[in-house]
Amino acid sequence: MIRPSALLMLCLTLLLPAAALARLDGPLEVTRPGKVRDLAEIRSSRTLRVLVNQSRNSSGEVQGQAIGVEYHRLRAFEQYLNGHARDGQEINLKIIPKAKDQLLGALARGEGDLVAPGELLDVKAAHKISTSDPIASGVPLWLVGVKGERRFTKLEQLSGRTLALTTGSAAADAISQVNQKLALHKQPPVKVEWVDPTLAVEDVLEMVQAGIFHLTIVEKPIAERWSKILPKLRFDKQVAISEPGDEYWFVRQDASMLRASIDRFLKTYRTPSDQDVAFQRIYRRLYQVRNPLARVDRQRLEKLRPVLQKHAREQGMDWLNLAALAFKESAFDPGARNSGGPTGLMQITPSAAQRVGVNNIESLDSNVQAGARYLALIRRKFFASPKLNERERMAFVLAAYNMGPERVQGMRTEARRRGLNPNQWFFQVERIAMEQVGMGAVSYVNSVNKYYLAFDRERESLEPPAPKIASRK
């Protein structure tokens, strides 16, 4: 919503795809591998480079409040190291967020000193990486669905069904093995939808609750944590997915002193009893997505499709981006009104509409026209750089639509200063937004993105083929 103050599905049998921490965020990409550093070199540099899983569940911080499960443990380790410093020089943590499946490779290349994934993560022998003592032992995987739908008691019952998984999911090997067994019995495999890289495990769980995805698999601690936020989720605990695993931190094999220090720290560390207080308080207030393709909403979208396609085409946009924004703003209600001034399907303000030459936003056509034109204006004026891919470009446009383009540009500047990727909103610039303005804008962009992905999965059925023109003879 513009405020007055600021105007794949991939179904296949499983084939594996190849102080405050957030203020210390580091680079997304490192072009030259750094040398291996053990504890002496780390103390000399006064910086411990920590590669973290970029998901908000693992490493998020909101306006100085920890929501990531690794935050407290890493801060305690920082204090432990400084408490044992002989020269009195303090070590600072430099947080480097990466996708889960990139963490160990980055460590092996010397881009960080320590990996703290916050989830189960398998180490490959080729990486030459050592594990710490277990942070958590015997961690099972749970099958997650939504209450009211069919329960499962064994993995083979998933034959022919689809699981939504993030790349790097700990369930990958287990599904591969069960598919081999199903093939021997000539049964359909369990299909895997590798979700879009803009989604983290917490996003997938929210979309399962909404009914956009039907099933996923996550570690027990993640399931238990998010069950307090997403109460409609159902956990089929009796399904034996794989042998329980252990959670670790990871270091290079030749960083033996660092590993020894980590193990000594872990022997005495206890998770704070209030670790999730801020997490629950923040997330319980946030908007949660629902299925935008439920029967009634799908019927509304079908009626709105011509006008959305018309104005998206005029502005060179994907009409499903307009549809996703319209659903988030007004739930496809052209008569929606807001006391602050936003009006209609796109919830655009009169002042924003006037900036793009639309003086009356009461009709459906003019309302969508104003919204599409305003999005195009933001895109053209602030986010036209060829360095942005189209998904990230749209995310920046949405963030600017919500809180103003100048503010978003300022966040990109701050991200660049801290070594984050200023051309990536998801998991990079959004970290600056979380710190500066809280979760509101991040939740807004993520929600519209989820609706877009939900529509995009059904694009073929939402876009009837053009009528054939009879040839003249």
Residue spans of the language-model regions?
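Extracytoplasmic small-molecule ligand-binding "clamshell" domains
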Residues: R23-V123, H127, W194-L199, E219, ...
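Acidic, polar ligand-binding/catalytic clefts
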Residues: N57, R75, R86-Q157, A223-R225, ...
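Extended ligand-binding regions for polar small-molecule ligands
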Residues: R23-I42, G68-Y80, V146-A172, K220-I222, ...
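Hydrophobic residues within well-ordered alpha-helices
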Residues: F77, L107-A108, L158, V204-Q209, ...
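Catalytic and substrate-binding regions of cell-wall glycan-acting enzymes that process beta-1,4-linked
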Residues: F250-V251, E392-E458
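Export/targeting segments at the very N-terminus of extracytoplasmic proteins
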Residues: R284-A331, D365-V368, F382-P386
